[in-house]
Regions:
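Bacterial N-terminal signal peptides
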Residues: 15-34
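N-terminal secretory signal peptides that target proteins for export/translocation
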Residues: 1-21
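Sec/Tat signal peptide C-region and signal peptidase I cleavage site
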Residues: 35-39
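Short, Φ-rich (hydrophobic/aromatic) sequence segments
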Residues: 3, 32, 134-136, 339-340
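N-terminal secretory/targeting leader peptides
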Residues: 40-131, 139, 146-343
């Protein structure tokens, strides 16, 4: 090295650039000394959520947290509105190494591991607090290990999506599933969704989301089910006179990272990602819970009757229907009872 530098400096002097060399070489050496110890990790995150959704906003919380805790270690790219991968395609993209992170639904996971369809069943999860306790305890640990081993995907944090409630075009007394007999309840068109509608005691009717508003207005359907924020954003409340807080599906997403990406990270970077994911999930969960509470008062202000039925009666009826179904045959023995026992 000394000979090379001496030769180089001699060449500079011979060309009359001694002064230039004295300025350039210190800069070069300083740059080499300042270079990061490892390469920057690219984290592309895919979600179908739109920019105003808390799920997108939480991903920027994750990005900003990593920028502070691990400066220069990550390049986080948030791809919202399904612009990078369409909803449902993220799992395969992660497994093929084409995507680092995503917000995955349990429906996505259950397509490859059918036993986890249990997490898509009605009245499995009681509320957001129960959701966090289930996934924060042994049940969640077991699921994460199996999903990582079988699918090559690490689940970092469970994220609250929303609680589905019933919105009726005309008011009626609703306390138990028997009170929904004959009610034309719009559900998404898959057999799993229609099964849930029937289990609630209603006459489940498939209808495209874009047709729900007109269906409620004209009486093609009597009711629909969605989280409260959707009732507002889709303006369903304009053609709704009663909201029944059945809470029949406390839905969630999993903030996930590919096992390949995770395995390549040093321990310090893993810790940074875990902490950033926890901060992002808390940001989302707190804001969604607040929004749902505020919306109840908003709907009441619109003249809509909002009430709570006998939720335990609904839970027992729906869970009994699931236990007799083809879906329950794929659930791990005893898992339903373990989830119900989490307090």
């Amino acid at each position: 090295m000394r000979i090379f530098l001496t030769g180089t400096m001699r060449a500079f002097y011979m060309l009359g650039f001694a002064a230039m060399a004295s300025r350039i070489l210190p800069v070069v050496f300083a740059a080499l000394l300042a270079a990061p110890a490892g390469a920057q990790t690219l984290l592309r995150i895919s979600t179908p959520a739109v920019p105003d959704d808390w799920h997108v906003k939480m991903l920027y919380v994750l990005r900003d947290d990593l920028a502070k805790s691990a400066p220069g270690r990550f390049e986080v790219q948030v791809h919202h509105s399904g612009t990078l991968f369409r909803q449902g395609a993220e799992v395969v993209a992660m497994q093929r190494g084409n995507l680092e992170m995503a917000l995955l639904s349990m429906q996505d996971i259950a397509r490859q591991l059918p036993e986890y369809s249990i997490f898509t069943a009605g009245y499995l999860i009681r509320d957001p607090a129960h959701l966090r306790k289930v996934w924060g305890g042994p049940i969640g640990d077991e699921a994460r290990r199996r999903i990582a081993q079988e699918m090559g995907i690490e689940l970092l944090q469970v994220v609250y999506l929303g609680t589905r409630e019933l919105g009726l075009r005309e008011p009626r007394p609703v306390k138990t599933p028997a009170d929904l007999a004959g009610l034309k309840l719009r559900m998404p068109g898959s057999k799993e969704w229609l099964f849930l509608g029937q289990a609630l005691g209603a006459s489940a009717t498939p209808l495209a989301f874009t047709e729900v508003y007109l269906g409620l207005k004209t009486g093609t359907i009597d009711a629909q089910d969605n989280p409260l924020p959707t009732l507002k954003s889709a303006k369903f409340y304009e053609v709704t006179k009663q909201i029944v807080l059945t809470g029949h599906l406390v839905d969630s997403l999993q903030l996930s990272i590919s096992a390949k990406t995770w395995g390549a990270l040093p321990a310090s970077d893993r810790d940074a990602v875990k902490k950033a994911a926890a901060a992002a999930a808390k940001y989302n969960d707190d804001n969604r819970a607040r929004e749902e509470k505020e919306l109840i008062e908003f709907f009441r202000g619109q003249g809509i009757a909002v009430g709570t039925p006998d939720v335990e009666a609904f839970r027992k009826t729906v869970q009994a229907a699931y236990l007799k179904s083809e879906y329950a045959q794929k659930w791990p023995r005893g898992l339903l009872e373990r989830i119900n026992a989490v307090k």
